[in-house]
């Protein structure tokens, strides 16, 4: 029977004041067309892969992101814009978790099975991801906008 091995575990809490600058330096440029929640997801995911000494997420690995609230500030922005009748496309796109997954895929040089889950139960999210996962493993993160990001890179032995 296979067992799980953690290659890296990264927790950023509290967030450093310059985390966006650190991300831009790591990527070689500022991420474009991403909201703060997606940027925070990318920041944590990139730190985790760096800690695992992986330049890109392995082909066949699964990507999972979970949160209690998702991109809350973007949702608030579009709610305010909807009241005026002028919802801006960029703000709307930032409120969509699928756009965060697309940005992670692009910046991690990866294609594959990616999912976002709203949940209060980290253990249940992890167990489900592990049950669905193959030999290439899993990159799983918990992202709370303007608060913290926590990521694990795990593989089967």
Report residues per predicted region.
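Conserved "HGTGT" condensation-loop signature of ketosynthase/thiolase-family condensing enzymes
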Residues: 1-157
